[in-house]
């Protein structure tokens, strides 16, 4: 099985003008569903090999309901000159079951808010190599926390119609309900709400969270929180649940941490 676009009209096209890209993002945001429509219970997603303590591992009511643990994919990129190297690592119960990568030439420079048009081609090419159908995808990048609610995780999630979560290191837009410059204990969640910088969403809407997945023991040092937002078919609260459940003593959730490492490994083979 390979994962191909369900909405080919949303495949990133770097030849579009910036105005056309932004208009496409508005269409993607309109198609995105920022609510839980996954085929697995969030409680079934764990960072270790322990079996989930839930009665059912699926939400589906179809006759062929699956009871096996969910497949969680992490996506990250590396760059070599004008080439993007996209890596996907799939885990099940904390074990790596598949790794794929793809290399595509980047056609445009980095433009804030238009990352998917620079990196999306390589990501979709990597998904085309994937034999596993992931239940949820964690993407290194923004989801709904975006000027038009269509960050990289949303663009990929909607195009493939797969539940997706954006995991970013920096806040692109929106207003946190508390300062992100303070030191917070592990597990702290700070809602990020839409403001005037988010043109497609009413002010005050919770579009994601700052999530403290790890913190130093020493009060004199601190680790900044991750910026977590729903990409597609996942709510803001569940997106944070998933990232927290898959963090394994590191700041990054295990799927994207391993994808980051594999992207660097794959990068070394690019000529």
Swiss-Prot record:
Its cofactor is Mg(2+). GO terms for biological process: DNA repair. It is found in: Cytoplasm. Its main location: cytoplasm. The keyword Iron does not apply. The record marks 110 as: Interaction with target DNA. InterPro entries: Endonuclease-V (IPR007581). It catalyses: Endonucleolytic cleavage at apurinic or apyrimidinic sites to products with a 5'-phosphate. The keyword S-adenosyl-L-methionine does not apply. It comes from the Archaea. GO terms for molecular function: deoxyribonuclease V activity; magnesium ion binding; RNA endonuclease activity, producing 5'-phosphomonoesters; single-stranded RNA binding. One of its GO terms (cellular component) is cytoplasm. Disulfide bonds: none annotated. Its EC number is 3.1.21.7. Residues 46-67 are annotated as: Disordered. CDD domains: Endonuclease_V. Belongs to the endonuclease V family. DNA repair enzyme involved in the repair of deaminated bases. Selectively cleaves double-stranded DNA at the second phosphodiester bond 3' to a deoxyinosine leaving behind the intact lesion on the nicked DNA. This is Endonuclease V. It comes from Haloarcula marismortui (strain ATCC 43049 / DSM 3752 / JCM 8966 / VKM B-1809) (Halobacterium marismortui). The lineage of its organism: Archaea, Methanobacteriati, Methanobacteriota, Stenosarchaea group, Halobacteria.
